[in-house]
Amino acid sequence: MTAARRGRRNRPPRVVLDTNVLLSALVFSGGALARLQGLWQSGAIVPLVSTTTAEELVRVLAYPKFKLDPGARQELLADHLPWAEVVEIASPPPPVPACRDPFDLPFLYLAASGRAEALVTGDADLLSIADGKARTVRSFVIVRPHDFLASLAGA
């Protein structure tokens, strides 16, 4: 994502953060991606969610490996969902590039339906659509988290 793309619209970029990126930002607050939480809470980015992607986040936060009690899960959701814009996915969903993993389709549908500027992911199947580079697919780029953060810092 270039500064020119953001500047043209003169508004914060609309972004889809896949579940693993969100987990890194929320659960691992000392991690490299914790900065994302400050970005959405300050209005520097607009995270997009759909019913399907929000349900996946709720389900994954309940995995035993995270050792999060219901109260902790609610707190983490409260650190994200109030800042997210809910996007309704049409039926049938919009056309998106072919993807090897059908579980990744909700993120592609969300990016296309929500007019996202970026789909931020470390997922190999999603990145393979863009040949592992930040490259525009339809109207949005599929980009690694660190590259996305660098693009914001360079703006």
Regions found by a protein language model. Give the residues of each.
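Acidic, PIN/NYN-like endoribonuclease modules and their adjacent C-terminal/linker elements
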Residues: 97, 114, 118, 124-155
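Hydrophobic/aromatic ligand-binding patch that stacks against planar heteroaromatic rings
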Residues: 39, 110, 134
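PIN-domain endoribonuclease scaffold, especially VapC-family toxins
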Residues: 39-94
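Short, flexible helix/strand-to-coil boundary loops that buttress conserved ligand/catalytic motifs
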Residues: 26-27, 61, 130
